[in-house]
């Protein structure tokens, strides 16, 4: 897809400096949590944006947002239920949404492949396709997106062989069509098998956020704008 540069500049008025991002998913990390003596506040030093790929508790997300002094943008995992006390303070749900934060266009799609009836945040492939279709207008209006945040991986790219951990084909189609800088997911725990932390697929860096991963988002220089 050829990006509409005029529409893109409407959303990204001018390039910003690098954005330091913390991505988290699936399993709580002792050094980030108040219950552990090894917790160090400097773990959050310089973090500008936090992305949660799901399956983390209310209190963990609430604590991270509070100590880091920045919002946590989260999608749901297949083990998540609706938070009993409402959305954690400092957390902004982006599941099924397209948003722009710090000049970064972010698309959020939580949940896993449907493997059990009567469970929330599980979808058949065709159901996920419908979710994506609802967001197409917003995506195209913005000239694409920069980061895809999901719980499940993309089909055929570091996904599992069982139904639960099979990735979505539509995620791969989104990457092929829009070439985002990053695709960040969780769900396939690295202790389940030899799943790499970082993979390069075409122009997209894929990050398995299991537990956590820190990285720096650097803006491209504008081309002839």
Where in the sequence are the language-model features?
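A short, gly/pro- and small-residue-rich
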Residues: 68-79, 168-171
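Binuclear metal-dependent phosphoesterase catalytic core
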Residues: 2-18, 98-102, 123, 174-178, ...
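Active-site regions of enzymes building and remodeling cell-envelope glycoconjugates
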Residues: 48, 69-74, 87-97, 201-209, ...
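Active-site neighborhood of phospho(di)ester-bond hydrolases with catalytic His/Asp-centered motifs
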Residues: 23-25, 49-55, 73-78, 94, ...
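Short glycine/proline-enriched coil/turn segments at helix->beta-strand junctions
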Residues: 18, 46-48, 68-71, 88-90, ...
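Metal-dependent catalytic neighborhoods of phosphoester/phosphodiester hydrolases
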Residues: 33-38, 56-70, 81-91, 159-161, ...
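N-terminal active-site segment of His-dependent metallophosphoesterases
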Residues: 1-64, 136-144
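Conserved catalytic scaffold of divalent metal-dependent phosphoesterases
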Residues: 24-32, 76-166, 211
